[in-house]
Amino acid sequence: MVFSNSNASVSLFRLVALVATLSHLVFTFVDAHGYVTFPASRAYMCKQGQAKNCGEIQYEPQSVEAPKGLPFARKGDGQLCSAGLGQFSQLDRQGPSAWPTTKASGVHSFSWTFTAQHATTDFKYFITKANWDSSKTSGLSASDLESDPFLTVSMNGKAPPRTMNHDLSKAMPSRSGYHVVYAVWTVDNTANAFYQCLDLDFGGGNSSSSSSSSNSSATSTTGSSSAASAATSSTTSSSVSESGTASTASGSGSDDDSSSSGDSSNGSSSDNNGGSSGSTTMPKSQIAQSGACRMKKRRRSPNASVLAARGDYRRHKSQMRRDRQG
């Protein structure tokens, strides 16, 4: 009898464990659906830890499921990204710096990961209007979006594979700056759909204007620096050239000409250098003195015949001294 009770206890334990396992599988299946992995949706950004303060969505990015009809057939203004689900309200944060963005130039397809493959009607992709207010901080509204999807992928009731790419049949709509793509996965055999928001940077507009401005400013600064360097180089070259001219004038003219040339040269050099003496430029007083000294030295130097005569005279004088001593 004890043995029988023991078997009954074991059987009951196994039954409870089996029910718990089946319940877990059922709930996992019900909760598991899908999300956009590239370009990374807000939900996926939260799952990956690339976005912060996400709340519950970081644990179940696949679960943004709500009744069909968004963004236009039913009202959901300000709550489109969360699909009106209060537990995922963090997805409705809005603003150019509220979410990490993906460069639109690198987007040639949209990639989904499905944790449950439902029969599907289609996938549709909407984008914010070209003139939408990208600086707004209130949640995304239907009026922010183009009324027609720029991409529709029909499934005709078929279930997608575990992962699926939707290639762009043509280029992304022409945009500038920060924009949001609203992706809708419509399930065929239920009343629900899944919703994902993707943040893109098209460049050359709102989100990158400060960066462009900074780059432009940096370029301008670099250009100014280059111009300044070129001006300095030009000034230095000019100063050296003018100093050389002054020296030549000193060698071939009078002391007065040399001095005036030096004054003129150094006057220009001083003006070009903003009144400061450059390391490669001699002060005018030194140039004048140098020219005068060279001039005097050249005037006093005897020619070759004089030097030869002096040599002969010294040799003759030395010979006479030797003769007298002998």
Swiss-Prot record:
GO-annotated molecular function: metal ion binding; monooxygenase activity
Cofactor note: Binds 1 copper ion per subunit.
Glycosylation sites (chain numbering): N206, N215, N266, N303
Cofactor: Cu(2+)
One GO CC term, this protein: extracellular region
Keyword Signal: yes
Enzyme nomenclature, EC number: 1.14.99.-
Record InterPro entries: Cellulose/chitin-bd_N, GlcNAc_Chitin_IntDeg, Ig_E-set
SUPFAM superfamilies given in the database record: E set domains (SSF81296)
Biological function: Lytic polysaccharide monooxygenase (LPMO) that oxidatively cleaves alpha- and beta-chitin with C1 regioselectivity. Catalysis by LPMOs requires the reduction of the active-site copper from Cu(II) to Cu(I) by a reducing agent and H(2)O(2) or O(2) as a cosubstrate. Exhibits enzymatic activity on U.maydis fungal cell wall chitin and Boosts chitin hydrolysis by chitinase GH18A.
GO terms of biological process kind: chitin catabolic process; polysaccharide catabolic process
Residues bound to Cu(2+): H33, H118
Protein name per UniProt: AA10 family lytic polysaccharide monooxygenase C
Superkingdom assignment: Eukaryota
Origin species: Mycosarcoma maydis (Corn smut fungus)
Domain Chitin-binding type-4: 33-200
